Amino acid sequence: MTFWNEIYAHFDPVAFSIFGLKVHWYGLMYVLALLVALYMAKFFVKKDRLKFSNQVLENYFIWVEIGVILGARFGYILIYSNAQIFYLTHPWEIFNPFYNGKFVGISGMSYHGAVIGFIIATILFCRKKRQNLWSLLDLCALSIPLGYFFGRIGNFLNQELFGRITDVSWGILVNGELRHPSQLYEACLEGITIFLILYFYRKYKKFDGELICVYVILYAIFRFLTEFLREADVQIGYFSFGLSLGQILSVFMLILGFSAYIKLLKNSQTEQKFNQNKS
């Protein structure tokens, strides 16, 4: 066994403590992910001369953060948790970071739920602030991937969302068994790779909303593939054809992404023809 294989034995998921409260690396990575996403948004606004002010972006990120947290938490409870009745009768426990008097943080977040919360928050923000919805979503498509990268690194450091059992040399020892570091696969594919693709693809953007559609399509494909190397949630298991819930949700995302792309493309072509005839 190499140091890498046994890295969890040498690594503490708790970064430090403040007045008895344990601060986990996952929490730090989550904050870093938000800061990186905001920085990237400002970077592309300046680089591509987009019509969004810093004040608009900062206000928007507050709205989005609230939407993402609510969506991620409620999404986990509704989709992945087997304690829906408990939370329905004890709603104050949904965001309770304490257990038996000890601070343990809020565990259980769903990315697909976060996406729903993100979309709702974005729609409400654009309606209230009179912003271009699809243009803002395109900016998010460029900003999210690198933030997502740090989020998955946080999952790895927090020793959660393990991969399936493997015999590859780079496997991570978890409870006596080597497992795929699937969190790192996702960080690279759904984070770095998608960012690089969109970074260069944006130069060929033909209509507002195109980048967010491409992001959704790419994420769905990569998530579907990496799920084959990721252990399914114990309380849910696998469905028909050995597919996980994450893969099933990714199929819906893929359909949604392609459908939105086709609709927006047709709308763009119709608008171009109308403008040509008008001139």
Swiss-Prot record:
What EC identifiers does the entry list? 2.5.1.145
PANTHER family named in the record: PHOSPHATIDYLGLYCEROL--PROLIPOPROTEIN DIACYLGLYCERYL TRANSFERASE, PROLIPOPROTEIN DIACYLGLYCERYL TRANSFERASE
Q: Which domain of life is it from?
A: Bacteria
Query: Which GO MF terms are attached to this record?
Result: phosphatidylglycerol-prolipoprotein diacylglyceryl transferase activity
Nucleotide-binding found in the keyword field = no
Q: Which UniProt keywords apply?
A: Cell inner membrane, Cell membrane, Membrane, Transferase, Transmembrane, Transmembrane helix
What is stated as this protein's family in its record? Belongs to the Lgt family.
> Which terms does the UniProt entry file under GO BP?
lipoprotein biosynthetic process
Q: Which HAMAP family match?
A: Lgt
Q: Could you say which enzyme class this protein belongs to?
A: transferase
Compartments annotated for it: namely:
Cell inner membrane
- State if Acetylation is listed as a keyword: no
Q: Which GO terms describe its cellular component?
A: plasma membrane
* Positions that bind a 1,2-diacyl-sn-glycero-3-phospho-(1'-sn-glycerol): 152
User: Pathway involvement?
Assistant: Protein modification; lipoprotein biosynthesis (diacylglyceryl transfer)
Task: Please name one Pfam family that this protein belongs to.
Answer: LGT
Protein name according to UniProt? Phosphatidylglycerol--prolipoprotein diacylglyceryl transferase
Transmembrane domains' residue ranges: 25-45, 60-80, 103-123, 133-153, 181-201, 209-229, 236-256
Membrane topology annotation: Multi-pass membrane protein
* Role summary: Catalyzes the transfer of the diacylglyceryl group from phosphatidylglycerol to the sulfhydryl group of the N-terminal cysteine of a prolipoprotein, the first step in the formation of mature lipoproteins.
